[in-house]
Amino acid sequence: MGDIIRIKRHHYVHILDNNTNVTRCMVGPLVYTRKENERCLFNPKPCIVVPPRFYCIVQNPCVRDASGNPVIGENSSVMLRMGEEEICFEQEPFPLQPGEVLKREEEEWLFKLKLIPVNTGYHVRCLCDFTDKNSVLRRAGTEWLVEGPQTYVPRVEVEVLREVHAHIISPNTALHIRALVKFTDRTGVPREAGDLWTVRTVGAYLPAVEEDVIGTFQGITLTDTEAVHLEALSNFTDVYGKRRRAGERWLVTKEDASIHIPDVHEKVSGKVRAIVLNEKEYCVVQNPLGADGLNEFGRKEVRKGECRFFLHPQEELLGGMQPINVVSKDQALLLQAVDFFDDNGKIRRPGEKWMLHGPAEYIPDVNVRILEQRNLIALDKNEGIYVMNTTTGVVRVVIGKPYMLNENEVLWEKDLSPKVEELLAFANGCMSEGERNPSFKSTRVRHRVVRFNVQHNAAVQIYDYKQKKLRVVLGPNLVILSPDEEFTVVSLSGGKPKVPNLLHCLQLFLGPRFSSDRIVVETSDHARLELDLSYNWYFDVNREEPDAKIFSVPDFIGDCCKTIASRIRGAVAAEDFDSFHRNSAKIIRVAVFGRGENGEINTSLRFSANNLVVTNIDIQSVEPTDAKTRDSLQKSVQLAIEITTKSQEAAARHGKERKDQEARGKLERQKLLDKIEVERTKTKWLQLQAQSEAVQASGQSVAEAKAKAESLLIEVDSELKQAEMRAKAYRITAESELKKQKQKLELELEFTKRQNELDIMKARQIAETEAERVQRMVNAIGRETIVAVAQAGPEMQAKLLGGLGLKGYLITDGKSPVNLFNTAQGLIDAGSSAQEHS
């Protein structure tokens, strides 16, 4: 760089004096001659230009006087405020004094002023004390909000912490605000740190720096069927002007507001639906709200329809909405008082029961409990129920008429043993041990009377354990048990040989019936035999006065079979095998029935203990128990059977041969008789054949002549009939053609006649129409008008010719004929005119 420094306009250089080590700034336009002890630190630089709406930050700015010029210190150097910053806005281009530095961010030193839009603000904080342009003293650490819309002018004493956006409060919404420090809000209300409040003003809300927005809360729409329960979080006055205490709960409905926005001091406990009762419904509300607005805990209230209401907080709906108890004439309600109350003038005590009979509609009082609804129990003449009086404990049977229990009665269930229950499930009341079902469950209605149909010729024993009496019922009959009666179950032996308790019955069959048994006996020669026996028996009972004696032996079948088997064994033991084998039936009958005084075998065996009578015994089979004896006996029996069979076969064979010989003789004799009859028939046939040939020969010529004559006669008759038919057809054709022509002519004549009549009628109508038209025209125009029109033409012609000086005119081309009539008319007109003039 030379000694001469040319500095352009708005440019500057820094000159260092090496002697004093002081740098000064030179601003153009200027031509500066550098001294020997001076040095130019850099080539001329353009001055700092800050365009509109921009700014720059100068670090270590120089100290300026009141006129804005840099202050020079004692050593002739520019005084600087070291460590400080200065913001330069739009102004004339200026140079950087020695020591000043432009603050750069991301290599940029020129910054654009920021715009604060509508509903936005800058949260700023003061870094050091200063007084702003409004003469407000700002202390270090003070924070405030710069609201838009405006251009934010930065200061070195203020830093921007964040950008704050407004919260939009739409209709039916609100903001919950909390105070961070003690301050006075923009509405002039003083707030303490931690205070909460609600902002409901619709629009944009820009929170102050001392405020914290908890959130936006949507309003709750309240309808006729929906309300809301609220709970106070602290003591406050709600939006409806009511003072609320912390923990208090209340109801807000549509009558209070159509939309409720929850306050910051309250919370929504829940939404409730309206309870709508029609005229046939009611409900019970527990802990209802009293007149003082407080719940009356422990009290109940009945609300009847038609109505609509909301449950207040801590109110409970017991049992939901319930229909009114409709009691028909065949029904009743069993009611019980739970507390003292006045029932239409009658004092009811706690625990007291009474019946409400229909027909009626009943809504229970809060002090009344409905125990049950009872219906009239319909009973046939053979049906009944067990009824117990709860006061006395007496159980009785009601049979044959509809019955309604009173307040002191209940249906009593009669319990029966499982065996009896299972026997009642069988039609005849009997079952074998193998038919028992271990998982059987009775379907009997226990409060219904126990009934059992006793079959014909059967008996049932019933025991009354209260009176300790027995009664026997003979069938056919219907047994109905009283509350203290039980059936006597009969357990009998069964099977072959007899097994005890194999058969169980409710009824005892009186017979006659039969039983089978299998016993083993031993003869005197020690042959053991197995006998299959059947007995016929019956009970000898007086049907007028049946005796319980027949039930005195529990297992009469087993007892009878044992007695008979004992007698048979004793009798067989005294006989050898051959003797018993030949006379087994007689020996057994004598052993069982015994002999009478006259030595004859008795016909029956009577058991006096129960009047059982055995009338007959049948030996079904006798078999040795020893295998060898049984085989030898079978062989001997088989041999005897074979001998008998062979003798019977020989006798049958001899009889067959004799019958065959007799049959062959009869057959030969019949053959001879048949041959004689054939020859006789053949002779008769030959005679008839000869007669037929003679008749055939004589009758052939006569038949041919008759046939030809008949053929000719038929042809002549046929031609005659054809001629008659043709003549008849021709006559019919001619008559039809004549009739057709006649009808055609008549139709044409009628058509012509009608057409002529129509033409005449048409002409007449046209003439009448024309005459009427002319008449109407004449009437419309008038007689004078017609005369004037008729005279107008000649007068005009006369005037025209007079004007031309002519008396008349005739124009022709020599080819057209001359209208002499018009000429004559003109002459006449002219003559008449002359006469008029004369």
Curated annotation (Swiss-Prot):
One Pfam family for this entry, by name?
A: MVP_shoulder
Keyword set for this entry? Cytoplasm, Nucleus, Phosphoprotein, Repeat, Ribonucleoprotein
Q: Which CDD domains match?
A: MVP_shoulder (cd08825)
Instruction: Give the UniProt subcellular location, in the record's own words.
Output: Cytoplasm; Nucleus
- Entry-linked InterPro entries: Band_7/SPFH_dom_sf, MVP, MVP_rep_dom, MVP_rep_sf, MVP_shoulder, Vault_2, Vault_2_sf, Vault_3
The UniProt entry annotates MVP repeats at 13-52, 53-114, 118-170, 171-223, 224-278, 280-328, 329-380, 381-433
Any keyword Membrane? no
- Its principal location? cytoplasm
Supply one GO CC term from the record. nucleus
What is this protein's function? Required for normal vault structure. Vaults are multi-subunit structures that may act as scaffolds for proteins involved in signal transduction. Vaults may also play a role in nucleo-cytoplasmic transport.
Quaternary structure, per UniProt, is: The vault ribonucleoprotein particle is a huge (400 A x 670 A) cage structure of 12.9 MDa. It consists of a dimer of half-vaults, with each half-vault comprising 39 identical major vault protein (MVP) chains, PARP4 and one or more vault RNAs (vRNAs).
Question: Does the record's keyword annotation contain Lyase?
Answer: no
Name under which the protein is recorded: Major vault protein
What domain of life does the native source organism fall in? Eukaryota
